[in-house]
């Protein structure tokens, strides 16, 4: 019995470990993918807190019907900075992997506060408190630090910042600087004003910022479709 237990554990360990040696062969090399900005990151945290992932997947499968409805199937590269990832196949509501830019900011605010006012058949709950609640920005740097420990390239040192400038460009690198996290969050909220309220930053603003970037980072016109099939 002991030998059987050891054999099962060994097999399970191999199943978990071996794919790690081939990870570079399964993640597509594409331009544009970056970590979340501080505002988007807080929006993602709210998305998870409110249980949005229980009804919405973020994984478009490589089937024709999914392409026609949602757009290009999801790439592994697009989720490389997600901890935890938001894949899945349960869809009480539609997949959101490419919802970014599909609707206006105002539509999202209205849909989140009163879903049936824009989609009459919707069964989604109302989330009016998101519009009334100020966004807590006090721990955004700590959240970025935690993700940095998992390998997400948020920067603390000048060397890390310079590496991000080289990889993502200065504009993105500035947003990934943990030392300026709170200031960067407030600046993006002020500049883009996702909720239409300029006097304060609300939770709904962070959530809309997150939703509006989903699926927008990769320019698929730059790649031949055959390239992506080599990673599947």
Where are these regions (language model features)?
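Post-cleavage N-terminal segment of exported redox proteins
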Residues: 1-36, 171-183, 210-232
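A mature extracytoplasmic/lumenal domain signature
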Residues: 59, 126-128, 212
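Electrostatic cytochrome c docking/interface patches
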Residues: 24-48, 60-63, 67, 92, ...
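The canonical Cys-X-X-Cys-His
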Residues: 43, 49-58, 108, 207-211
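Short pre-active-site segment immediately N-terminal to redox-active cysteine/selenocysteine motifs
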Residues: 50-54, 59, 92-95, 123
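Surface-exposed patches in mature extracellular/periplasmic domains of secreted proteins
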Residues: 55, 120-127, 218-226
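Electron-transfer interface patches adjacent to heme c in soluble/periplasmic c-type cytochromes
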Residues: 2-10, 68-203, 231-232
């Amino acid at each position: 019995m002991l030998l059987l237990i050891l054999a099962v554990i060994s097999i399970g360990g191999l199943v978990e470990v071996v794919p790690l040696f081939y990870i570079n062969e399964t993640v597509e090399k594409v331009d544009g993918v970056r970590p979340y900005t501080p505002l988007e990151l807080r929006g993602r945290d709210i998305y998870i807190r409110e249980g949005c992932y229980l009804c919405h997947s973020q994984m478009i499968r490589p089937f024709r019907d999914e392409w026609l409805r949602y757009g290009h199937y999801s790439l592994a590269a697009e989720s490389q900075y997600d901890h935890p990832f938001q894949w899945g196949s349960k869809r009480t509501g539609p997949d959101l992997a490419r919802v970014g830019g599909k609707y206006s900011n105002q539509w999202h605010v209205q849909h989140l506060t009163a879903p049936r006012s824009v989609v009459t058949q919707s069964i989604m709950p109302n989330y009016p408190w998101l519009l009334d609640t100020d966004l807590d920005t006090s721990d955004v740097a700590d959240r970025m630090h935690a993700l940095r420990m998992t390998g997400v390239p948020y920067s603390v040192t000048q060397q890390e910042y310079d590496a991000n400038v080289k990889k993502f460009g200065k504009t993105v690198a500035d947003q990934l600087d943990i030392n300026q996290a709170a200031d960067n969050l407030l600046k993006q909220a002020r500049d883009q004003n996702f909720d239409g309220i300029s006097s304060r930053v609300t939770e709904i603003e962070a959530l809309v910022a997150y939703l509006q970037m989903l699926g927008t980072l990769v320019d698929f016109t730059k790649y031949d479709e055959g390239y992506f099939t080599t990673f599947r």
